[in-house]
Amino acid sequence: MSPERPPRTDIPRNLSFIAALTERAYYRSQRPSLEEESEEEPGEGGTRPGARSRAHVPGRGRRARSAPAGGGGARTARSRSPDTRKRVRFADALGLELAVVRRFRPGEPPRVPRHVQVQLQRDALRHFAPCPPRARGLQEARVALEPALEPGFAARLQAQRICLERADAGPLGVAGSARVLDLAYEKRVSVRWSADGWRSLRESPASYAGPAPSPPRADRFAFRLPAPPVGGTLLFALRYRVTGREFWDNNGGRDYALLGPEHPAGAGAAEPQGWIHFI
């Protein structure tokens, strides 16, 4: 005689299983093409309700809906929960305007609100750093040499055969001219100069610029040199070669000197901010 079967006391469907059924029903309604999953009905042998009848997949264990293994199923369930979906709302759905369009006529400039004008006037000086003192460039620090205006220039020219007429420094360099006695038709005039105190030197030729006013009878030659170095001095002397002879004008042995600017032109700190126009 078989022992009497104990009365069935387990709950046929617990709360987690019911939640899983509700979730699956929701996604089936949203995606009808989702693969349907069949479930076995409770049998005589005490088969646990809710076990899936899906085909056996090698390497994949079967687990109950009410107890996900490893927490992975719980994360999947949470990610599929309809309560955690992100929603996008547009401004027009909330009664707001998507864009604000303002049209202005050419003859009617827009009105700037009073509070904007007050703010601009109050912050006008705070928005910009104080202007640095304007750098002294070559044109502003113009250094000119005009020996032709000095007394005794004609006597010096007669004695030296060559004299500096003028020389001035500009933003593009040094421009000058020299007078030489007209001793022969063929003559060569050049300028020897240095920007490092004669540690190195170069020589630039001068070009014929026409006859000079007399007396004495002389010709004028023009020349151009680089600008004096910043914070330094450009030294130069004149050289005249004619009929196999050579004459110099080196300012009585002191050389001619043109001073360079103390700071490079346009130097100074850049403006931290630019103008901002408000409409």
Swiss-Prot record:
GO terms for biological process: glycogen metabolic process. Residues 176-198 are annotated as: Glycogen-binding motif. Signal peptide: none annotated. Keywords: Carbohydrate metabolism, Glycogen metabolism, Phosphoprotein. It comes from Mus musculus. This is Protein phosphatase 1 regulatory subunit 3E. Residues 51-65 have a biased composition (Basic residues). Gene3D superfamilies: Carbohydrate binding type-21 domain (2.60.40.2440).
